[in-house]
Amino acid sequence: MKNPAPYRYDIVGSFLRTKAIHEARSKFEAGEISAEELTKVEDAEITGLVKKEENVGLHAVTDGEYRRSFWHMDFLWGLTGTQKVKSEHFSVAFKGFQPKAETVKIVDKLDFPDDHPFLKHFAFLQSVASDLVQPKQCIPSPSMLHLICCVRSTDYQPIERYKDEQVLLDDLAAAYQKAVKAFYAAGCRYLQLDDTSWGEFCSAEKRKAYAERGIDVDEVGRKYVYVLNKILEAKPEDMVITMHICRGNFRSTWSSTGGYEPVAEILFGHCNVDGFFLEYDSDRAGGFEPLRYIGKQKVVLGLVTSKDAKLEKKEDVIARIREASKYVPLEQLALSPQCGFASTEEGNLVTDADQWSKLTLVREIAEEVWAD
């Protein structure tokens, strides 16, 4: 049977951390509880979250990223050949609050270790999800490691092995191929790659800043599609791999603005993922015209914001779905919130009740628009 993901109404992945999670993480960092005690709290809270996800009617469920500090760093720090580093500031500036100044650098040959902690995290999610839903695993796109270490960083010096950048790209692809196979072996059939690089490359301001440093972001984008397509060669037929594209989501703030046109042909026209989750909740994302480059991929429209509590009007969202269907057939479209509710452990400036109201709205709209 064909894997139906992404679903007509779906989620990006992260949820607001509960009070118990916040308290346990604080105690763990202060040395007041052990790693085992922290895991016990996380397990209990994730079990409760999955029940709530099922109760709201979701077909795909996640662990809310409850075990992570960041949507991306925890995974990247777990790769062989990377190192967690403290820095003076986060790797990208947000319009408002700034995240913790922790980043990553490449210090050795890249690889995906057999004991990467996320494999155990997925196994637990699968163990508490019912047979009626599909557990979904979200990890950062490979582009993020290259973007943070080699593009955003103004003082990047490649290690000896990576003086030829092609070797780096091929090692990165091989590491992620191993990740895909390992998650598949663990039972994962729905994997999402989260990626803010394309959001940056949509920004005229950021494109100009990179150009002034001698960086051709279109060329970088082509390299990322090369890596992504190499990874997708390892994807078994009954596994779905999607990509979520974001313009930043930290405590309800953002980091990039600009429509998809600058990256549309390179990304939508050539990247072989099964679907794109696309942020479309504000005018910062531009119009739907760039979707004309979409081929067979499904497009999950992020028309409902996760950044504030105000509920969108159903008729407005439905009108926008109809508008998007001028460029992509309605049967290839789906609906989700624009991003997660807590891309970092701090979370967006919304309440627990708000996030469930948003998901209920997404489900109700999808049921009105699509018969299936």
Task: Name these PLM-found stretches.
Residues 1-372:
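Domain-level signal for soluble alpha/beta catalytic cores
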